[in-house]
From Swiss-Prot:
Positions with a binding annotation for sn-glycerol 3-phosphate: K110, G140, K195, D248, S258, R259, N260
Family classification: Belongs to the NAD-dependent glycerol-3-phosphate dehydrogenase family.
This enzyme's EC code(s): 1.1.1.94
GO terms assigned for molecular function: glycerol-3-phosphate dehydrogenase [NAD(P)+] activity; NAD binding
Keywords on record: Cytoplasm, Lipid biosynthesis, Lipid metabolism, NAD, NADP, Nucleotide-binding, Oxidoreductase, Phospholipid biosynthesis, Phospholipid metabolism
Cellular compartments per GO CC: cytosol
Keyword Chloroplast applies: no
Annotated catalysed reactions: sn-glycerol 3-phosphate + NAD(+) = dihydroxyacetone phosphate + NADH + H(+); sn-glycerol 3-phosphate + NADP(+) = dihydroxyacetone phosphate + NADPH + H(+)
Protein name, entry field: Glycerol-3-phosphate dehydrogenase [NAD(P)+] 2
Class of this enzyme: oxidoreductase
HAMAP family: NAD_Glyc3P_dehydrog
Record bears the keyword Cell membrane: no
UniProt-listed InterPro entries: 6-PGluconate_DH-like_C_sf, 6PGD_dom2, G3P_DH_NAD-dep, G3P_DH_NAD-dep_C, G3P_DH_NAD-dep_N, NAD(P)-bd_dom_sf
Length: 334
């Protein structure tokens, strides 16, 4: 059975990477946190805060930050990859020669790669040559700011190697953060990649002043299309009914702390993609709707909500027009 390193490398000091580094440290681990910018690493080491990405969260002294990837990866048998989905490949190409042989590689990213239509675990295997059993995914209803406040939360650790999954589970079990293992990597990744798109749709509805009935319909019908895509790819439906599916979907669609929902609200209020992006950075769902829709098309899976979000984000359709389009679809059994 694979164990977990006494020092774990978390590659990416954004909100999610920093929050998970804190979880690992609070659970008793020694963590090296890689930041792209040296000033972010220096600030973490000197003040114990990361105000740019996770303001207000005091980071334990067992987290050491660095902007040197070689330093971060040296000797780590477990590497958490906390970079955006669309930059995963480029970062891994730089880091691959530095990765210790046999390391457990853990994706924290939620998305489908544009062009290749690969899930993140597939990108990791493709670039590093790792065995599928070496690759794990962490996903669930995990808003970074709430986790940083030590609010109770649960997540899924998915890996085909049960030993690696259990080792990660133990390393993350901090008292306020409860991990569950699952062998269904595909389902865990599809749930995470698709929920951001549905959260954009929920945000758009809020932005134009619609209420809870609309939000409930979007979440429920959004789940239906996520399950259709997941099962077409071989996912277990139970995974998508659990934390990595329904759980993540509800948190991301309903929380005002959700970046994808907040971005959708701006679009609903009439802001352009460009102006919304300047205010709060373009979110993962904007890119994911393009790659997920292409993936669904390749499997002949119908995803009308994803299609509507894609049209609003990339084809100039207004939110009102998207609603008219969805409500004008042919009626059918649930």
């Amino acid at each position: 059975m694979a164990g977990i390193a006494s020092t774990v490398a978390v590659m990416g000091a954004g909100a999610w990477g920093t929050a998970l580094a804190k979880v690992l440290a609070d659970a008793g681990g020694e963590v090296t946190l890689w930041a792209r910018r040296a000033e972010v690493a220096d600030q973490i080491n000197t003040t114990r805060y990361n105000p740019d990405y996770l303001p207000g969260a005091l980071l334990p002294p067992s987290i050491h930050a660095t902007a040197d990837a070689e330093e971060a990866l040296g000797g780590a048998s477990t590497v958490l990859l906390g970079v955006p989905a669309q930059t995963m490949r480029a970062n891994l190409e730089r880091w691959a020669p530095l990765l210790p042989e046999g390391a457990t590689l853990v994706s924290l990213a939620k998305g489908i790669e544009l062009g290749t239509l690969m899930r993140m675990s597939q990108v990791i295997i493709s670039v590093t040559g790792a065995e599928p059993a070496q690759v794990a995914v962490i996903s669930g209803p995990n808003l970074a700011s709430e986790i940083a406040e030590c609010q109770p939360a649960a997540t899924v650790v998915a890996c085909s190697d049960s030993g690696r999954a259990v080792a990660l589970q133990r390393a993350l079990n901090s008292g306020y953060f409860r991990p569950y293992t699952n062998a269904d990597v595909v389902g865990t990744e599809i749930g995470g990649a698709c929920k951001n798109i549905i959260a954009l749709a929920c945000g758009m509805a809020v932005g134009i002043g619609l209420g809870e009935n609309t939000a409930a319909a979007i979440i429920t019908r959004g789940l239906a299309e996520i399950i259709r895509l997941g099962t077409a790819l071989g996912a277990n439906g139970a995974t998508l009914a659990g934390l990595a599916g329904v759980g993540d979907l509800v948190a991301t669609c309903t929380s005002p702390r959700s970046r994808n929902r907040s971005f959708g609200e701006r679009l609903g209020r009439g802001e352009t993609l460009q102006s919304a992006g300047k205010a709060c950075h373009v979110v993962e769902g904007v890119t994911s709707c393009e790659s997920v829709l292409a993936l669904a098309s390749s499997y002949d899976v119908e995803m009308p909500l994803t299609d509507a979000v894609h049209r609003v984000c990339h084809k100039g359709l207004s939110v009102d027009e998207a609603i008219t389009l969805l409500l004008g679809r042919r009626t059918k059994p649930e």
